[in-house]
Amino acid sequence: MNNNTTDNSTLQQIAHAAVEPLGFEVLEVQVQSQGGEKIVLVRVDRLDEQPVTMEDLTKASRAAEAEFDRLDPVAGEYRLEFESPGSKRPLTRARHFERMLGLKARVRGEGHAFTAPIKAVSGDQVTFDVSGQDVTVSASAVQANLAEFPDRHR
């Protein structure tokens, strides 16, 4: 590895370019440190919204690994890991909120910080039921994660 330093958006672009042609969406890229080891964690979902399998993660990981090796965007040694979004599912686009309609989301941004059920989605606008009051935010202007796990795959 070389001494490049790359921000998460660039790492996300690299991962996206590698896995999107295979039918995957990159939801999130995080650089973490565990016990002195650097880990680049990539959360992916299937574009067809089917459950992510171990085979899917292997296929996405191999494709991205080749691209990360070619571009060498991370300084020093690191481990590239892939996982499905699971209970930590980031909600970054209106369609993510729409898919999880009725479930609770943890929302931060636009002067808000709350956990509430997703009530409605219209365009980029997402409405939540916050203690009986409708609160509408722009999906692209907030950070949100699923706060409860659905009882079935969505």
UniProtKB/Swiss-Prot annotation:
- Single Gene Ontology BP annotation: ribosomal small subunit assembly
Task: Write down any Gene Ontology CC term.
Answer: cytosol
Q: Does the keyword Amino-acid biosynthesis apply?
A: no
InterPro entries attached to this UniProt entry: Ribosome_maturation_RimP, RimP_C, RimP_N, RimP_N_sf
Top-rank taxon of the source lineage equals: Bacteria
Q: Does the keyword Cytoplasm apply?
A: yes
- Keyword tags: Cytoplasm, Ribosome biogenesis
The principal localisation class reads cytoplasm
One Pfam annotation reads: DUF150_C
Q: Where is the protein situated, by its record's location annotation?
A: Cytoplasm
Q: Report the sequence similarity comment from the record.
A: Belongs to the RimP family.
Q: What does this protein do?
A: Required for maturation of 30S ribosomal subunits.
Spell out the PANTHER family in the cross-references: RIBOSOME MATURATION FACTOR RIMP
Instruction: Write the protein's name.
Output: Ribosome maturation factor RimP
Q: Native species of this protein? A: Deinococcus deserti (strain DSM 17065 / CIP 109153 / LMG 22923 / VCD115)
Instruction: Show the taxonomic lineage.
Output: Bacteria, Thermotogati, Deinococcota, Deinococci, Deinococcales
